Amino acid sequence: MEEVETAEEQLAKQHRKEKKDLQAKIQSMKNAVPKNDKKRRKQLTEDIAKLEAELSQKHENELKLQNTSSVEEVSDALDSMSVANHEEQSDPSKQSRTSKAQKRRDKKAALEKEREMRIAEAEVENLSGSRHQEGLKLREKLVERHLQIKEISSDGHCMYRAVEHQLTERGLALGLKELRDQTAQYMRSHADDFMPFLTNPNTGDMYTAEEFEKYCSDVADTAAWGGQLELKALSQVLQLPIEVIQADSPCITIGEEYDKPKITLIYMRHAYGLGEHYNSVEPLKDLANEEEG
């Protein structure tokens, strides 16, 4: 029979995965900034430190919450045992009526209620946090355009999935794999436009031909996160301008030479614990409903 992981083991496993994911994310961020670009390198160092601090704080809070829950669980269990023993001593007939299974169910229900209360409290505290404030600013910008955020899953493919969603809305059938393949192929065939922006994280030197090929292979065949370099390639492949809306910075447009309707993406720095994420946009629901009516 398989051993069931304890809550502590599950949390430790989750934390290890999140740390590993963060390191992969940081590596991707470093690769996208040239070594000789001191201004962007300085900003990158600050961004990485912030991401690491946020993840560390998140893990610390989760450990505190788990430890608190564990203490309360033991306390509740002892209280329940004390009450049960007293009742059983005063009325032995209750021993048969109150089963151990029922006690476990009651204890679990009480613990779950406590957990839900803590989550609710955390949500209230988060209203003043970076993620919430970023969301408010983006919504304000989008409402002016009669748009709203279209959530895209955070799986490493978010940028490509957001572009895929935009293309689908235009009746263009280009899937995730095809977008990745075409992006990688364009970068391979225009290596001089991309290699100066990619450096080996260990040496700081510009990528060799072999390292660049590995990078392109990852673009095509893995869930490697896509950034501005990949957006540049996608804009050229699709021959469409790509606009990126951000909360605290002006919008940027890649591929302005193409006089066609823009693909619009949302760039979010605080959407998830691991940092950057891309979402798509869709018509504002209330406006869409009015037009349909």
Swiss-Prot record:
* Stretches that traverse the bilayer: none
Instruction: Note the CDD domains from the entry.
Output: OTU_OTUD6 (cd22761)
For this protein, the record's Gene3D superfamilies field holds: 3.90.70.80
According to the UniProt entry, its GO molecular function terms are: cysteine-type deubiquitinase activity
UniProt region (Variable-loop), positions on chain: 219-229
Query: Which stretches does the entry tag as region Cys-loop?
Result: 152-158
Q: Where is this region: Disordered?
A: 1-43, 57-114
Gene Ontology BP terms: antiviral innate immune response; protein deubiquitination; proteolysis
Q: Which reaction does this chain catalyze?
A: Thiol-dependent hydrolysis of ester, thioester, amide, peptide and isopeptide bonds formed by the C-terminal Gly of ubiquitin (a 76-residue protein attached to proteins as an intracellular targeting signal)
Q: Does the keyword Protease belong to this entry? A: yes
Q: Tell me yes or no: is Protease among this UniProt entry's keywords.
A: yes
Q: Explain the purpose of this protein.
A: Deubiquitinating enzyme that may play a role in the ubiquitin-dependent regulation of different cellular processes.
Could you identify this protein by its name? Answer: Deubiquitinase OTUD6B
Native organism: Danio rerio (Zebrafish)
Q: Supply the source organism's classification.
A: Eukaryota, Metazoa, Chordata, Craniata, Vertebrata
